[in-house]
């Protein structure tokens, strides 16, 4: 089996984490790190408490703690919304091999707007950045949008992409 076999289950879990974040009064973002079909770590958004505590940041830190290394080569990061620039740089620093997100973020996405996840030039700064990860966007977008629509975060989703 490969990572693609687990994409739907892991993305569904991210959407559940996003809903849990909304239920506790925070922004609707959930993320997790997996490798070889095994859940390594999860993260719920906690930016209401600390502005840099995005779901991806927490999932990456938790994966680092669990695995005992900051080299997460071979891991996939799943997230309910496209990672922002800060999270995208962290994904590159942790050397994540694959990123799967549900909702595009046309105003602040680290992939669709700022191209950080695809930027091959960052590789020249080894050992700080890993190679560009494989990126799959729009996975279970409709389901993630249902959670997003419970909040004022209307600007996320493919319908808001600039033409």
Predicted segments — roles?
Residues 40-47:
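Short beta->alpha transition motifs characteristic of CBS
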Residues 48-58, 62:
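A short, polar/charged loop-to-alpha-helix boundary motif
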Residues 24-28:
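Short, flexible loop/turn motifs enriched in small residues
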Residues 47, 79, 103:
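Residues that line or immediately flank small-molecule/substrate-binding pockets and catalytic motifs
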Residues 1-21, 90-163:
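Zinc-dependent deaminase
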Residues 61-98:
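Helix-adjacent hinge/juxtasegments
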Residues 8, 15, 53, 57, ...:
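Glycine-rich phosphate-binding loop at the start of an alpha helix
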Residues 29-37:
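Short beta-strand scaffold segments in enzyme catalytic cores
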């Amino acid at each position: 089996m490969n990572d693609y076999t687990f994409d739907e289950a892991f993305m569904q879990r991210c959407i559940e984490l996003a809903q849990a974040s909304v239920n506790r009064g925070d922004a609707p973002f959930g993320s997790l790190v997996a490798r070889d079909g095994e859940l390594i770590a999860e993260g719920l958004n906690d930016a209401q408490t600390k502005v840099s505590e995005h779901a991806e940041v927490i999932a990456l830190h938790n994966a680092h703690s669990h695995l005992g290394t900051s080299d997460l080569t071979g891991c996939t990061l799943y997230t309910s919304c496209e990672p922002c620039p800060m999270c995208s740089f962290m994904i590159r620093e942790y050397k994540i091999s694959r990123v799967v997100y549900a909702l595009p973020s046309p105003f602040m996405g680290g992939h669709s707007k700022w191209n950080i996840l695809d930027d091959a030039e960052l590789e020249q700064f080894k050992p700080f950045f890993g190679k560009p990860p494989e990126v799959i966007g729009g996975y279970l977008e409709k389901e993630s949008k249902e959670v997003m629509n419970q909040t004022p975060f209307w600007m996320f989703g493919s319908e808001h992409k600039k033409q």
